Structures are given as C-alpha cells and as structure tokens.
A protein has these predicted regions:
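Terminal anchoring/processing modules of extracellular glycoproteins
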Residues: 1-189
Length: 189
C-alpha cells in the first residue's frame, strides 16, 4: 500500500513548477522525499543516512534543507497510511506496469567507454527491482540510479545507469521487476 503526497500549486499558470513529492510504502516501510523543478530533481532525502542529497553538489551551496523535516513528514505519512488502510477495508492500490527503454548515453563506438541507460517510465506504485546483466550474468560494478521521479499524471519514472565498454561479443540486458508485471521484463542491447 502506498500513500503519495504531491504538493504543487495549480492556482495559476506558471512558467516553472516546483514539486515536493513524498511517499511511504507499506509493508516494505520504505519512503521517499524529494523536490523537483520542472521535472528535474533538486534533492532528495536519504532516509537511511538521514541526510539531504543534492542532485548536483553545487545546489547545496545556494540552498539548504534539514533532513529532519522530511523524517517528521514520513512519520505523519505512515500514521495517515495506517488510518487510510483501515478505512478502505485494505483495498489494494492499482498496479500500473512500467514502460522500459534501454539506450546508450552517446553514439556507440567499439572500445570507447559509454553508459547504458535503462529508463523506466509510467509506473505505480514506486516499487521496482532492476538488475543489469552482461551475457546473462548480473553486473553491479559502477551501477547507479536516480530516486523515483514523479510525473504530472501521478505515476513515476526512474533511470538506472551502467557504465560499459562496447564490444561485438557482449550482450546487455536491463531486467525490470514490478508488481504490475506478470514476469520480469528484459530489454536487450
């Protein structure tokens, strides 16, 4: 069960939008709190380390955010979710399966370092498992990812990255698992 809180102003039409997105997921007891400007992450709060993580370190030189505020919001979200679950008679949320695209960061040249991008889009709830495979074997070295990024339609998107050295022998896969999928989805490159 997921409780999502997206706060943005719809009162007037503006050229730019800042979104404060937060969610709490039960029974996994995972949470996310982030700020977004025109679709790009400004920062998120690492709930384990209890600290603000700026998407670009330079952002932290011009602004500040106390992670404790997000942690307090999560405690309220958890309490609200528990109440809503009881009131809804434990009716589950609808699982919306993701759309997945796999592409290189730049034009591929054999032997030249590059990055594969697994773009996972239009899914809910914000729970996903991604595994990178090279020739069918899991790869973890150098792998990175974004937090869950909110969309205007209240679905989510997320990016996963794998640095690689292109060869003619290697085959790469981005394996995505989500509650809305009957089986894992593999995208090949």
């Amino acid at each position: 069960t997921v409780l999502i809180s997206l706060q943005e102003s719809w009162a007037i039409k503006e050229d730019h939008v800042i979104i404060q997105a937060e969610f709490y997921l039960n029974p996994e007891e995972s949470a996310e709190f982030m700020f977004d400007f025109d679709g790009d992450e400004i920062f998120h709060v690492d709930m384990q380390k209890k600290e603000t993580v700026w998407r670009l370190p330079e952002f932290g030189h011009f602004a500040s955010f106390e992670a404790q505020g997000a942690l307090a919001n999560m405690a309220v979200m958890k309490a609200n979710l528990d109440i809503m679950i009881k009131r809804s008679n434990n009716t589950p949320n609808t699982n919306v399966p993701p759309e997945v695209t796999l592409l290189p960061n730049k034009p591929v040249e054999l032997g030249e370092p590059n990055t594969l991008i697994c773009f996972i889009d239009k899914f809910s709830p914000p729970v996903i498992s991604v595994t990178w495979l090279r020739n069918g074997i899991p790869v973890t070295d150098g792998v990175s990812q974004t937090v869950f990024l909110p969309r205007d339609d209240h679905l989510f998107r997320k990016f996963h990255y794998l640095p690689f050295l292109p060869t003619t022998e290697d085959v790469y896969d981005c394996k995505v698992e989500h509650w809305g999928l009957n089986e894992p989805l593999l995208k090949h490159w």
